From Swiss-Prot:
Chain positions recorded as ATP binding sites: 8, 11, 91, 143, 146
PANTHER family reported in the protein's UniProt record: MULTIFUNCTIONAL CCA PROTEIN
GO molecular function, one term: phosphatase activity
Binding site for Mg(2+): 21, 23
Protein name per the record: Multifunctional CCA protein
Length: 413
């Protein structure tokens, strides 16, 4: 048998970037031979084995054939006579269809095996499909978009983009399971330049199918005095990229992506104003999160950001009572860590505007000071002093928090 390192490990090595994952293909072996050497079988649809020491994945060389629509509609063939080139031919992109042999000691040996000119496409910074079999797996559209967010200086080859559009038109994207869509979107959001992912998805038409609420934002004008970039879609991409540049969490980046969804449904006769877009954003966001089965942590933060971001931008004008009501609505008193992420998302919103990425955002520090003051109130002591009257306790704690915030900020109640 012969073992080869394949795919992303070879690509990243040639690009000079850290290798994130190592995948191996075994040519000329049977499942029985693998288990005899201590490998543990874990593959469900085709033979994949874990190395007895490293726990890295080793897959038997295979070919695949489309048998039904969607991500799972494949039939796999594996046998000792399946060649390395045949295995590489089933891969999505030329830059992912390269290999190097692995010595018995685990070292990469020999030249790069590159039957589809992946090295040339790496030099040209191009995503190009290996074969027309690309159209058989709709996940590949999402993968290319995610790779674009990681390798922001790459472009999609014209012929590959044409195939992607054909797939979208044929309804292949509609067959994707929600969990896989979310998985790829989430991974793309965590890359260095998430806006590139959405640019590719828009270009091939897939964004309108998987995230129509986001796709609707392009071409919607905003007031130029607040938003020099004018276009809402452009603004949202700047917000997401700012959050990524700061290294913020997935929850913050998702909130950045969805905070202005309501602007996509603003009546044309009131543009470029967007009165009430916050509540419309919330109403659009709820079914989106349900449809894609977005994790609770991401959904909950996104809903708070969508509802409250306009209020946070205006906190310099608020009195202590309004600030305490904001803390209570956003559950900041019980969940200060989530409130810190709310601040990050709103700061990203303020700075995700043309020419304003370094603009001060004093609202964040004001809110941090105010929240610390509100949380310093000893609600238990107040309750013990009042007794069993729940409403009186609630009102007294509320008043004490207002007074604490007013004192901390030296402002009126």
């Amino acid at each position: 048998m012969n073992i080869y390192a394949v795919g992303g490990a070879i690509r990243d090595e040639l690009l000079g970037v850290p290798v994130q994952d190592r995948d191996y293909v075994v040519v000329g072996a049977t499942p029985e031979q693998m288990t005899a050497q201590g490998f543990r079988a874990v593959g469900k649809d085709f033979p994949v084995f874990l190395h007895p020491q490293t726990q890295e994945e080793y897959a038997l060389a295979r070919t695949e054939r489309k048998t039904a629509a969607g991500y799972h509609g494949f039939q796999f063939h594996y046998a000792p006579d399946v060649t390395l080139d045949e295995d590489l031919a089933r891969r999505d992109l030329t830059i992912n269809a390269m290999a190097r042999e692995v010595s018995p000691e685990g070292a990469l040996v020999g030249p790069v095996i590159d039957p589809f000119d992946g090295q040339a496409d790496l030099r040209a910074r191009v995503f190009r499909h290996v074969s027309d079999a690309f159209v058989e797996d709709p996940v590949r559209i999402l993968r290319i978009a995610r790779f674009a967010a990681r390798f922001a200086d790459f472009t999609v080859a014209d012929e590959t983009l044409a195939l992607m559009r054909r797939m979208v038109d044929a309804g292949e994207v509609d067959a994707l399971v929600p969990e896989r869509v979310w998985q790829e979107i989430a991974r793309g959001l965590m890359e260095a330049k998430p806006s590139r992912m959405f640019a590719v998805l828009r270009d091939c038409g897939a964004l309108a199918r998987i995230l129509p609420e986001v796709d609707a934002l392009w071409g919607v004008p905003q007031r130029a005095d607040y938003h020099p970039e004018v276009d809402t879609g452009v603004h949202v991409m700047m917000v997401v990229d700012y959050a990524a540049k700061q290294g913020y969490s997935l929850a913050v980046r998702f909130a950045a992506l969805t905070h202005d969804l309501g602007k996509g449904t603003t009546p044309a006769d009131v543009l470029p104003r967007h009165v009430g877009h916050e509540s419309r954003s919330v109403e659009l966001l709820k079914p989106l999160c349900e449809r894609l089965r977005v994790p609770n942590e991401c959904r909950d933060l996104a809903l708070v950001v969508a509802r409250e971001h306009g209020n946070l931008h205006r906190v310099m004008e608020m009195g202590a009572a309004a600030l305490v009501r904001l803390f209570e609505r956003s559950d900041a008193l019980r969940k200060p860590a989530r409130f810190a992420e709310l601040l990050q998302a709103c700061e990203s919103d303020a700075r995700g505007r043309l020419g304003l990425d370094a603009q001060p955002y004093p609202q964040a520090e004001r809110l941090r000071v105010a929240l610390a003051a509100a949380r310093s109130v000893d609600a238990g002591a107040i309750a013990r002093g009042i007794g069993n009257d729940t409403e009186k306790i609630k009102e007294a704690v509320h008043r004490a928090r207002i007074q604490a915030v007013a004192q901390a900020l030296a402002i009126g109640e």
